[in-house]
From Swiss-Prot:
Record localization: Endoplasmic reticulum membrane
Family, similarity comment: Belongs to the DDRGK1 family.
Protein's recorded name: DDRGK domain-containing protein 1
Lineage per the UniProt record: Eukaryota, Metazoa, Placozoa, Uniplacotomia, Trichoplacea
SUPFAM superfamilies: Winged helix' DNA-binding domain
Amino acid sequence: MAAIIYLAIAAVASILLFVAVKLLSTDTKTEIRTDDDVGELIGRENPVPQRPRARARRGLRNKTNRSKTQRQHDNDYDDYDDEYQDDGFLEEPVYDRKMGTKKLRKLEEKAEKKAMREQMEAEREDKINRQELREQNRRKEEERKAKEREEKEEAERKLKEEQEKREYEEYLRLKESFSVENEGSGEAEIAQESQSLLQEFIDYIKNNKVVLLEDVAAHFKLRTEDVINRIQTLQSMDRLTGVVDDRGKYIYISVEELNAIAKFIKQRGRVSISELAESSNSLINLQSDSKASHTIESVNDSPAEISVNA
């Protein structure tokens, strides 16, 4: 009998303990709920009749609150997106399944603007680089042309100096060949006499117009070869102009007469020696100051070719 009583007391204690645990669990869940959940729980336990208009206002208010919450969420996401995009962390838009169409379109527009901006910057840099390259090429071309001009001018200057030096040396040698030996004469007097003899040599040929080289050599007590060399030197110095035939005659022709002959040949085109000889009487004056006149035919009796040295 005592055992039965003991078992009954144990069963009652177990039931009381189970009920206490259930009540404690229910109280804990009730405390965690928010005020809205408590209100809803109370409303369900004690339903209070509400008017339709009040329910509409409350629904509109809840919808407005949800819209504000969504906009705030979008703004926060935009700020986050802009911050990382400006810092260069967001290279391409990250798509999410929960992302709306409007947000997706906005991200695509941002990506397109960024790509367009990068393309414009690349084109601008490329344009600047091309301009700099053209400017460098232009400066290099100007420097090259300037250097070529300087080199050409320097070469022409050196050539002119060498020619002048060579002509001057030839002139000195020519003067020395006409020097005379006079006892008691100074260097200045000898140089003056040499210059006088040189000018006399030139005037002798110009005045006679047509001279035999042997006669010139005999007149100035020179060898015929020396006379030829002196005439060639004077022609290179533009002190004499004329032609030498194969019979040892030198015909002096002035610059004006050479220009007239050149004009005649240019007007007629190609001309033969005989045609030139026929027209030379009217183009070249062969009258000498001390001798009788000569004709060009007397100089060109043979068909030998005449060389003109201008």
